[in-house]
Swiss-Prot record:
CDD domains: Phosphoglycerate_kinase (cd00318). This is Phosphoglycerate kinase. It comes from Bartonella quintana (strain Toulouse). ATP binds at K201, E323, G353, G354, D355, T356. Pathway: Carbohydrate degradation; glycolysis; pyruvate from D-glyceraldehyde 3-phosphate: step 2/5. The gene is pgk.
Amino acid sequence: MGFRTLDDVDVTGKRVLVRVDFNVPMSQGKVCDETRLKRHKETLLELQKRGAKLILLSHCGRPKGQGEPEFSLRPVVRVLEKIINQPVAFAPDCVGVAAQTAIEALQNGGLLLLENVRFHPGEEKNDCSFAEALAHNGDLYVNDAFSVSHRAHASVEGITHLLPSYAGRSLQCELQALEKGLDNPKRPVVALVGGAKVSSKLFVLNHLVEKVDYLVIGGGMANSFLAAQGVHIGKSLCEHALMQTIKKVIEKAQEYQCTLLLPVDAVVGFRFEKGAPHRLYDIGDIPDDGMILDIGTRSIAHINEVIDKAATLVWNGPLGVFEMSPFDQGTIAVARHAAECSLTGKCVSIAGGGDTVFALNHAGVANDFTYLSTAGGAFLEWMEGKVLPGIFALRQA
């Protein structure tokens, strides 16, 4: 994979700085979702068992380079202790005397969580002096957070120039899964891309048509593709300014022999609200006052037929307005079929992005996919074919 892992280092008695992603949703000082915390369990327990002194680095929220209580990592401590069944100490800063004092008290196998690295402006600026202050507290560095590896920040990229650097198990596992998705996949490869706007995923689409055999477009994005082909879409969400750009994507798909699939029917609502009056229409018959809010039954069947052909499936973005019933049914139906194909070994299935994870959980199949990435921006940038600064830095370390 081009970088060193925990298999390549003796950590006994070493101060190991571990970059984790504890950027979790909180409400009134309580953690609302433990998913990201659980992703690091294997790495932390392995290092603890091997006698390392673990010093955890993370950000939380966007505190604008200064301490803000609502973004403190302190509430994470109790939840993390429950997950790993080990005591976790907390330091009220990530550098300086407070951090150093807490680190000096660590025993072999001890765990310490430092306060939010974004409480310092040097973190997001990738400031050399801040990276040096972080590195001063460790003997080696482990990146276990793919979800932040698209950021050229001090605790992700800068620090790798100052300490021997390694990939943690979570990062290693994620990269191995993603490699199976687009870098070295089994074919045919099917990509499902949904969501509201083409503009947010234009680079993704342009990259995917070069890589995959079938590209399925759903969600609000599909409306813009349909409009670009002259289809009347009523009052549906559409990015009319992108018509020429979308036509170029369609032409590129033809050039690379990538089969593009768009909805052939749709569930059309007449108000944008839960339980709004709705009807099923063929794509050529969308009424003037209607809004396409979900894919229809024939579209579901077509997509499922394509998934049946897949050896590799990559999914990002819901296929309808999944947060509003009954316009979640298309996403649910396709998700359950994809999960069944994955469980029976017909395909390797990889899904990622915040809305995608939420939608698959909503469908009750999140655990049935081969790999589910909790990364948002990093997953999208990987789908765009970009080099992620945190991963590149590990390969150079």
